[in-house]
Curated annotation (Swiss-Prot):
Its main location: cytoplasm. The gene is lipA. [4Fe-4S] cluster 2 binds at residues 88, 92, 95. Belongs to the radical SAM superfamily. Lipoyl synthase family. This is Lipoyl synthase. Binds 2 [4Fe-4S] clusters per subunit. One cluster is coordinated with 3 cysteines and an exchangeable S-adenosyl-L-methionine. It is an enzyme of class 2 (transferase). Gene3D superfamilies: Aldolase class I. Pfam families: LIAS_N, Radical_SAM.
């Protein structure tokens, strides 16, 4: 059976989560929510990158999560690579990545990833993954293998990893990352603690904060980063409380963006946050001590990650 036959998406994926999705009236998108389509050279680069990814049997979160910035990022020659397959063991109802039973790890993926990054001549890459609760280390060793192979092939390339929470395997995962820590360690809190059972079934807010703090304690020179979505029913004050928690756990880089509903089978958008409010989040974050804060309607965790890393002194 091929992966598409076993991959659940939308309503099929979220049908068995503990807190059921309650349909809401679809809000009209405001004028500041605009998806940019590439043209000319950007369109050509977009097609080149897609062809290269298929040739090397690689996945990107840009495609699998239906990111609205895919045309802009591919058009500029950047991509966020998603390792360990395209099937996730979690059923998060905000995310468009498919759920199901994953395939065994591809032992050649680290080399194939490194070859692709080298061929694309990328100065900065983001490597992320699906959740792999089926693996004893949550996939930590595969991350490290990808980091090592990429550095061997492209010594000047800076590497950011966007990792899952390694539920129940955190101590093992942290020890493995000691072998080859990334240049930036990113783990997204996604939302406020009140909404965790609804938005992140299987995850734990305090556990995610612990991951970020303990990694930083082991690697004080490696910046830590986290991201949030708005529009799921949180309040501005709750977002600011999360920012304080992140700073209390030594997180230095931040992204906040507008949640956009991938399908009617996903959590509805309950509010569109005005750009002025995003600016307020950014101002408050910098006042709290974040080295860099990217806050805006179309911001995603790895959107312009290279520029954010540059602002934090990584590149």
């Amino acid at each position: 059976m091929d992966s598409t036959a076993r991959k659940q998406r939308g309503a099929d994926k979220t049908a068995r989560i503990p807190i059921k999705i309650v349909p809401a009236e679809r809000l009209k998108k405001p004028e500041w929510i605009r998806i940019r389509l590439g043209a000319g050279h950007e369109a050509e680069r977009f097609n080149e990158i897609k062809a290269s990814l298929r040739e090397h049997k690689l996945h990107t979160v840009c495609e699998e999560a239906s990111c609205p910035n895919i045309h802009e990022c591919f058009g500029k020659g950047t991509a966020t690579f998603m390792i360990m397959g395209d099937i996730c063991t979690r059923r998060c109802p905000f995310c468009d990545v498919g759920h199901g039973r994953p395939e065994p790890l591809n032992a050649n993926e680290p080399q194939e990833l490194a070859a692709t990054i080298g061929a694309m001549r990328l100065n900065y890459v983001v490597i992320t993954s699906v959740d792999r609760d089926d693996l004893r280390d949550g996939g930590a060793q595969h991350f490290v293998d990808c980091i090592r192979e990429t550095r061997a092939a492209s010594p000047k390339t800076r590497i950011e990893v966007l990792v899952p929470d390694f539920r129940g395997r955190l101590d093992v995962a942290l020890e493995i990352f000691d072998q080859a820590p990334p240049d930036v360690m990113n783990h997204n809190l996604e939302t406020v603690p009140r909404l965790y059972k609804q938005a992140r079934p299987g995850a734990d807010y305090a556990y995610s904060l612990r991951l970020l703090k303990e990694f930083k304690a082991r690697h004080p020179d490696v910046p830590t980063k986290s991201g949030l979505m708005v529009g799921l029913g949180e309040t501005d004050d709750e977002i600011l409380d999360v920012l304080r928690d992140l700073r209390a756990h030594d997180v230095e880089m931040l992204t906040i963006g507008q949640y956009l509903q991938p399908s009617t089978g996903h959590l509805p958008v309950l509010r569109y946050v005005h750009p002025d409010t995003f600016k307020m989040f950014e101002t408050e974050a910098l006042a709290m001590g974040f080295k860099n804060a990217a806050c805006g309607p179309m911001v995603r965790s790895s959107y312009w990650a290279d520029q954010q890393a540059y602002g934090a002194g990584v590149v």
